[in-house]
Regions:
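Large intracellular
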Residues: 1-39, 111-154
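Helix-termination/interfacial motifs at the ends of transmembrane alpha-helices
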Residues: 28-107
Length: 154
């Protein structure tokens, strides 16, 4: 069951008018967006932090390399540490965390659109519009392929 829809329907059953319904539900959508943005920001922090950690590793590798310039055999392994930590930082940021941020943004946008569609349906109910009119209005927000499936279900 969709709690957002249930809450809106309960408000209508309890006698809330359209204006009160819209105000309350839009407030819920805004709160949800703020929560999502906060979570996206936390993961974005890791996207920004990973290359910095890679650079710290690079500096450590360079310090090790420069500290042992007298021993030619130690230069290679120290240089490898320097280069690998840069690679690890870029890999973690771009291959692990960036896709997570992208998915979080996509899911958030999807949920906002979904809730706005639910709100439009609830507004139609509050205005006592015909069920067919509400159905047509909501179907118009769908891609054409899904619209045809929606009409068959009617």
């Amino acid at each position: 069951p969709d709690k957002f829809f249930e809450k809106g329907m309960q408000m209508l059953v309890d006698g809330a008018d359209e204006q009160k319904l819209v105000k309350q539900m839009k407030s819920e959508i805004a709160s949800m967006k703020a929560r999502h943005e906060s979570q996206q920001g936390a993961v974005q922090g890791w996207v920004n932090l990973a290359p910095a950690m890679g650079m710290i590793g690079t500096l450590i590798g360079l310090v090790l390399m420069l500290g042992n310039m007298g021993d030619p055999k130690s230069i290679g392994p120290a240089m490898a540490v320097a280069l690998l930590t840069t690679l690890y930082g870029a890999f973690v940021a771009n291959v692990m965390f960036m896709p997570i941020v992208g998915k979080l943004e996509y899911y958030s946008a999807y949920e906002v659109v979904y809730r706005e569609m639910v709100l439009e349906g609830l507004r139609g109910i509050a205005r006592s519009e015909s069920p067919r009119n509400i159905q047509d209005q909501m179907a118009s927000a769908l891609p054409p392929k899904l619209q045809s499936k929606f009409e068959v279900a009617a």
